[in-house]
From Swiss-Prot:
4-CDP-2-C-methyl-D-erythritol 2-phosphate binds at residues 9-11, 35-36, 57-59, 62-66, 133-136, 140, 143. Binds 1 divalent metal cation per subunit. Homotrimer. The record marks H35, T134 as: Transition state stabilizer. It comes from Enterococcus faecalis (strain ATCC 700802 / V583). This is 2-C-methyl-D-erythritol 2,4-cyclodiphosphate synthase. The lineage of its organism: Bacteria, Bacillati, Bacillota, Bacilli, Lactobacillales.
Length: 157
């Protein structure tokens, strides 16, 4: 059986927070606001994987009302999701994602993001693809008010 899931996440850019995307801390004057580390890419991937497995979403598994997830490392949450999906008999075939950001430029960090995310799911780097694009100055992303991410995951059983 093959299952496909999609995930989407956005977070607001604010001062005095680190900018963590795909488990990589990027040098930038703002970071993403959230209960956890607000890693928008990893959150979208988590939702894509959970959706494909029919296991709910990130908010159900790691609610922001639970203090144990305050400032949580999202890559560690992804590891837990991978374990949960594995216990359900699924393996991840591949993950494909797109980061939506006006700034900073993502290209220098994509290889490290792929490595982090692949390792956390016990995948080969070739099973994870990450792209980045701008919103051509339109909307909240284009106005540099936030960053978004879209992910698709293929699971096999």
């Amino acid at each position: 059986m093959i299952r496909i899931g999609q995930g989407f996440d956005v977070h607001q850019l604010v001062p005095q927070r680190p900018l963590i995307i795909g488990g990589v801390t990027l040098p930038y004057e703002k970071g993403l606001l959230g209960h956890s580390d607000a890693d928008v890419l990893t959150h979208a991937i988590i939702d894509a994987i959970l959706g494909a497995a029919g296991l709910g979403d990130i908010g159900q598994l790691f609610p922001e009302t639970d203090p144990q997830f305050k400032n949580a490392n999202s890559v560690n949450l992804l590891k837990k999701v991978n374990e949960k999906v594995g216990r359900s008999g699924f393996t991840i075939g591949n993950i494909d994602c797109t980061i939506l950001a006006e700034e900073p430029k993502m290209s220098p960090y994509l290889a490290e993001m792929k490595k982090n995310l692949a390792a956390s799911c016990h995948l080969a780097v070739t099973q994870v693809n990450i792209k980045a694009t701008t919103m051509e100055t339109m909307g909240f992303v284009g106005k540099k008010e936030g960053i978004g991410a879209i992910a698709v995951a293929l699971l096999e059983k």
